[in-house]
């Protein structure tokens, strides 16, 4: 029986899953849209929704909870300064998942997870080694 089995294991250990979702949350908040596999996107959605709700509370305790969940201080600052005011009047449903076909190598179902009222210019901003080398 599968009573109480709510989340997918995604063929990873608990530590690996937690680290992966922390990185994915930070990437989604930074770029406001990421492409990943459909099961990962479905598991990421409630984590990000709870982080946005924490950002809307805007207390010291909620900020510390967000830091412990995400471990990226720059993205926590963006969560509380930019994302939370943007969704102040929305009660849940901050993200959407769009199916994006199948991956070429292993035919895995792919999906785009993005914020509903996302900033178009945020995608690809400050990412990759070329951005860092040009700035230096």
Swiss-Prot record:
The keyword Metal-binding does not apply. The lineage of its organism: Bacteria, Pseudomonadati, Pseudomonadota, Alphaproteobacteria, Hyphomicrobiales. Keywords: Ribonucleoprotein, Ribosomal protein. It comes from Rhodopseudomonas palustris (strain BisA53). PANTHER family: LARGE RIBOSOMAL SUBUNIT PROTEIN BL17M, RIBOSOMAL PROTEIN L17. This is Large ribosomal subunit protein bL17. Belongs to the bacterial ribosomal protein bL17 family. The gene is rplQ. One of its GO terms (cellular component) is cytosolic large ribosomal subunit. GO terms for molecular function: structural constituent of ribosome.
